[in-house]
């Protein structure tokens, strides 16, 4: 907080809007997001937060979906400035910010790791998706970018979103690796359903219907915790696949 004066930064974004990286994209993204279920969400405050972050972290490219995180933090804190500092800390002190630098190299790494874990732990589902020409990057990208905060608008008890807060606790402790585990748990939970759908239905279900599903409601909390406990993904497996990915990239670079 000592290095950044939020009020001054916001004033700068309004006085010199041309200096805001991705300013036009941010405004467009926020304004077209459907917040109809929550009339209290202040779009201008969300835009202020995202524009300010864009100035403070020019090396991090804004990505569609970050607006959900800003809206989530704004709602749970009730304070625009506090939401800004929390999001700034998220970008600077966790591995989340690294997803959006250097040609999205880290995000691509997690796509690879996720697909390999899916192949190892849920081979039938993996093959079913492959037969239907569905790449995991089609649907897990929003999971990493929004950290599942796109589910927040559909949660009944937003004053105490148990599952989303549990996911964030895990993320703050383990970083983006926790999103791998949550994502695989989601696919495990919905595996029978997914394998009954065709190409278009699968994509619609994974991208649009899961965020609105009972999975993220407080009533599903106990079942979700059982899934997390019983369906473990060893950190050593993730590390081995990350090493595999780095070797693969080195070989490709030498070609």
Annotated model-derived regions:
Residues 134, 184-255:
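C-terminal regulatory/linker segments that are acidic, Ser/Thr- and Pro-rich
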Residues 1-214:
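Internal, helix-rich recognition cores of eukaryotic regulatory domains
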């Amino acid at each position: 907080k000592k290095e950044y004066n939020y009020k001054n930064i916001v004033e700068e974004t309004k006085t010199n809007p041309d200096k805001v990286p991705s300013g036009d994209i941010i405004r467009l993204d926020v304004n077209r997001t459907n917040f109809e279920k929550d009339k209290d969400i202040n779009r201008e405050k969300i835009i202020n937060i995202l524009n300010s972050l864009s100035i403070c972290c020019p090396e991090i490219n804004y990505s569609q979906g970050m607006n959900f995180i800003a809206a989530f933090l704004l709602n749970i804190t009730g304070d625009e400035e506090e939401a800004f500092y929390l999001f700034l800390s998220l970008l600077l002190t966790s591995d989340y910010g690294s997803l959006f630098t250097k040609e999205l190299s880290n995000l691509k790494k997690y796509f690879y790791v996720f697909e390999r874990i899916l192949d190892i732990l849920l081979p039938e589902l993996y093959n079913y998706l492959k037969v239907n020409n569905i790449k995991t990057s089609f649907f897990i990208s929003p999971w990493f970018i929004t950290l599942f905060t796109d589910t927040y608008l559909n949660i009944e008890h937003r004053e105490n979103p148990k599952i989303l807060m549990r996911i964030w606790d895990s993320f703050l402790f383990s970083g983006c690796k926790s999103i791998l585990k949550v994502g695989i748990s989601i696919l495990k939970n919905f595996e029978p359903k997914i394998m009954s759908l065709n190409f278009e239905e699968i994509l619609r279900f994974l991208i649009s219907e899961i965020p609105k599903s009972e999975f993220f409601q407080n009533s599903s909390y106990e079942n979700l915790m059982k899934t997390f406990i019983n369906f473990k993904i060893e950190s050593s497996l993730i590390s081995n696949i990350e090493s595999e990915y780095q070797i693969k990239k080195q070989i490709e670079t030498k070609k």
